[in-house]
Each structure stands twice: as C-alpha cells, then as structure tokens.
C-alpha cells in the first residue's frame, strides 16, 4: 500500500527515493534502523543502479537510518560508477576472498566442536588444501563429510574420500549453472584461458590458444564478463570470477 500510494511518477529513481525517504522517517521516529540486503547486484539494469544510488544519496543527505548491504561480482564496481559517477564515494567496497588460514581453521573446527566432533590436524590441512580457504567450498566439503561419516573424529582418510563426492556436487551445481548456457565460442574462450596455465592470463595468450587475433576475441570477452564468468583483472588480463573454475573445466573438458 505504501509503495502503490507513493510510486506514481513512473520515474524509478524518483519513486524509489520517495519510498526510502518515507521508510527512513518512520524508522527514525521509531528509533530503529533499516538494513536492506541485495544479492547478485551485478544483474541489475543501469536504471535500477541509478535509482539505488539516487535514493541512497538522498537518505544520506537527510541523515535517515537506512543502509544497504549488497553483494555482486567484481564488475559491479565499474557498473555502479557508470550508473552514477558519485557511486564510488557512496559505497564501501569490500573484496570477499578466500579466508586466511586461521579463519578457515576456525570455520572448519568450531561448528563441529559444539557437537563434540573433532578433526585431526591432517584432516584440517587437507580441507584447506582442497578448498583454498574459499568459504563456500569449505561449507560444501564439510557438509559432505558430515553426511558421509558418523565418526566423532574426522580423519584424513575420510576427507580424501569426500573430496571426489564434493567435486561431483560442485560440478553439477555451483559450476555447471555458470557454464551450461555458454555458446561453443564462449566455452572455447574459457578453455583457452585454462590452457594459458597461469591466472590471471593475458588476452594475447588466450588469442594464441584460440588461434585468433586479439581484436577478434574482444566481443567474446565482453560477453563472458556480462555473463559474470570472467572479469578484467588488469589491463589486457582476465580471470575467472569464481575460484577453481579452471579445475572444473579441466575435469569436464579433459584439458591436458
């Protein structure tokens, strides 16, 4: 009802700003704060990002207790800058990367300890080696271990047995949903990145393994960035947006 009574101008930025200002004033009067979470923000249209930036700018000016916590792929920083030039000053951009070793150990060990289950040191080392500290992979492997074992002490052998099962789970879900809709040419680009050996890799090397000119693969690069599969790591360089995507392609495409 609130939205329908306010959002009448058919201007997304203006309507969204009006709604947030009213919500912010209600929250301020009630002595509470509003936190709005948005995931996968890289899929937003430019008009939607403009509306977000405009609305946040206005509630900040008015000192209203409204905040956003957004998550997205690396290209999001550029997208927000293109939507509104002042966006880079509005948002605090935090890179979410692999956990440092001490935090990875804590993520593995502490939840299990609460249920009187313990990991051997060798098991913890193997989990960190496999996951490279990436939080989602830790979650998936430890979930597989939890389902597969009823022992109160998780051994190295148990971890090694579960890594192949976790590979299957990741391949059929996490990785495949990102790759299945690629065209043959786009997949060729991704495979060429893997053949480069080191990541990030240069576009020149990708073009070499595709046996094409650098200029001719530019559209494929742009398409894959738009799909959220790769990002521009530096000038003339690209990398995968998710860890171990190269391992997935090696497994599924039989890349030497």
Language model features with spans:
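Amphipathic alpha-helical "lid/sensor" segments that cap RecA-like P-loop NTPase cores
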Residues: 104-173
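Conserved AAA+ ATPase "SRH/arginine-finger" region at the nucleotide-binding site
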Residues: 92-103
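C-terminal leucine-rich, beta-strand-based interaction scaffolds used for sensing/assembly
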Residues: 122, 168-256
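Short regulatory helix/loop adjacent to the ATP-binding pocket of P-loop NTPases
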Residues: 75-91
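Conserved strand-to-helix beginnings and helix N-cap segments that scaffold or border functional pockets
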Residues: 46-53, 105, 139, 186, ...
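Conserved Walker B catalytic segment
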Residues: 5-74, 82
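Short glycine-enriched loops at secondary-structure junctions
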Residues: 72-77, 100
